[in-house]
Amino acid sequence: MSYRSFVHSIAIASTIGLAPPAWAETPALPAAVSHQQVPDTYRFPLGKLDIVALSDGTVPQDLHQLLTHTKPAEVDDLLHRSFLDNPVEASINAFLITDGARRILVDTGSGQLFGPGYGGKLVDSLASIGTTPEDITDILITHIHTDHTGGLVVDGRRTFPNATVHVGKPDIDFFLDPSNAARTGYAQKYFDEAAKTIGVYDKAGKVKPFADRATILPGVVATIHQGHTPGSAFFNVTSEGQSIIFVGDIIHVAAVQFPKPSITIVYDQDPTKAASVRQTAFAQFAGDRQLIAAPHLPFPGVGHVRADGHGKFGWFPVEYRNRAGQ
C-alpha cells in the first residue's frame, strides 16, 4: 500500500484535535479499554548525567495497514515468534536528561492530539519525579511528527514556556512550508499539525534549527539521517566516556523490523532511505555495543542491538534495577 493511497483510504477528520496523527494513525482506534498504569518512569545514570525514560502512554496499531514492503502473512509470522498478535501496542516514550545546569527533554509525546485515552501522559510522568514543565530548559526533537511534537502545546499554548526547542533544519524547512504538501504528496494534516506545535515555538523565537553533526549542547551531538522525515535526527549524548544515542523513529516494531529491517512504514517520507538508514545503524550499534533509546520500543525503550547474521538483528532491553545502593 502506498502512502498516498493509505491516506486517501482513511478519510481523516480535518479538525486537528480529531485527526489520528503520525505514528498513531490507524483506520479507526477501538473504544478505549482501560490498561491504565501509574505514571511510568525509569531512571538510570550515564556518567555524570541523570536520565529518565518517561512514558507518554501507548496506542494500538494495526500493522497490516501500517507496514510496507511486506505482506500480512509475513508480519503475522514475525509477531508470532515474539508471542504477539496484530494489532500490537506501541509505546510512546520521551526522555529527560539532567546535567545539573539543564533539564533536557528528548521528544514530547503526542499531547492532546491523539484524543482521550491515547498518549498525553508526559506531564504526569514528569510530575511523578518532581519536575514541572517550567523546569525544562531544552527540548531535542528527533523529527517533526505529532507523536514527538504534540506535547509541545496544551490548548494552543506552549507547555514548556522556558524551553528552547532544537530540531533539524531540513524538518523545519519541510514541515513549516505548507506548499510541500502539494509538491510531495505528504498529507496536509502533518503540515497543519507542525504549525500548531513546533510553529508556536518558532513564532516565539524559541526554535534553534541544527545541521548535521552539530554540537547543539555540551555533550550532545546531532546527526541527520534522512528517510523517515527529511530531518530525522539521532542525538549522541556522552558523559565521562559513556554514551547513549537517541534514535527517533528508526524503529517502530521490534518484533518485525529487527529481524527484517527492510520492512518500512507508511509514514516514511522516503522508505528506501529509511530502510537503508535502519540497516546501517543497526549494524553499527551492534558492532559498537552502543546503548540506544527509542520512542516506540516497549517502555522504557532503552537497550542494545545484537547482530544475528544474514542482515537480522535482535533487541535486548537494559536490565531492570530498583535499589538505592551503589
Whereabouts are the PLM-identified features?
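Histidine-centered catalytic micro-motifs
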Residues: 139-149, 225-232, 293-300
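Bacterial N-terminal signal peptides
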Residues: 8-18
